[in-house]
Amino acid sequence: MIFPKLLSYSSSDLEMGFIPSDPQHCLVPVTATISPTGSAAGDNFSFLVATPSALAESGKFGWGRGILIVDSFTWAGVERSLNRLLAHAARDTWQDVAQALNKELLWEFDGYQPG
């Protein structure tokens, strides 16, 4: 059984340790690097951390894949949410783990076809 592990996570829009000016009204893109436990290299999975009010104001409508909806943004909350997701994603192969995570997050290799 392959168990996924969170190696790192960050945002291109918000430096780690800082919070948005209004943590209850924000959209923060995040990329998480996730690997099989024991591996130093991982795959990138991206998602948007969004509050309901910011999501409504942005006019972005969709089914919700790749969006973590929170009442208020905190880095600790993002990490907790990721770890909860990973706790339920163990599978027989890394490919199966990544496909399971890809149902909620946006996997960098989604749709990739080797040439």
Predicted regions and their residues:
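Short, compact, well-ordered microdomains
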Residues: R80-G115
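Short helix/strand-capping turn motifs
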Residues: M1-W94
